[in-house]
Amino acid sequence: MNMQKMLQQAKALQSKMEKKIKEFEQEEFEFVYQKSITIQIKGNYEIIKMDINKELIDPEDKTMLEEMISEAINEAISAITEEKEKITKGAMPF
């Protein structure tokens, strides 16, 4: 296989991967944390919507709610990152 053909294949693969990533970044995902917090988030980590069960809202325990929101967002981001890695690793020939 000559070098020019290899470069063309690499460019085609890169272009295909970039397209998949752009599509993924516009996809919307929904995550539910402990059946209490629902997060809608795009593949580019943009949070679209968050719904918090009203039973969690306790003016006397603001810290607990803040911690749960942080944990829910972090879990959603981790899941998106894992899915994105599957796309990028799946496109690599080695």
UniProtKB/Swiss-Prot annotation:
Gene3D superfamilies: Nucleoid-associated protein YbaB-like domain (3.30.1310.10)
Keyword Manganese appears in the UniProt entry: no
Alphabetical keyword list: Cytoplasm, DNA-binding
Entry GO CC: bacterial nucleoid; cytoplasm
Subcellular localization(s) per the UniProt record: Cytoplasm, Nucleoid
Main subcellular localisation: cytoplasm
Cytoplasm is among the record's keywords: yes
Domain of life: Bacteria
GO molecular function: DNA binding
Pfam families assigned: YbaB_DNA_bd
Complex and partners: Homodimer.
Free-text function comment from the UniProt entry: Binds to DNA and alters its conformation. May be involved in regulation of gene expression, nucleoid organization and DNA protection.
NCBIfam families per the UniProt record, alphabetical: DNA_YbaB_EbfC
Family under the similarity heading: Belongs to the YbaB/EbfC family.
Name of the protein in its database record: Nucleoid-associated protein MYPE8070
Naturally occurring in which organism (per UniProt): Malacoplasma penetrans (strain HF-2)
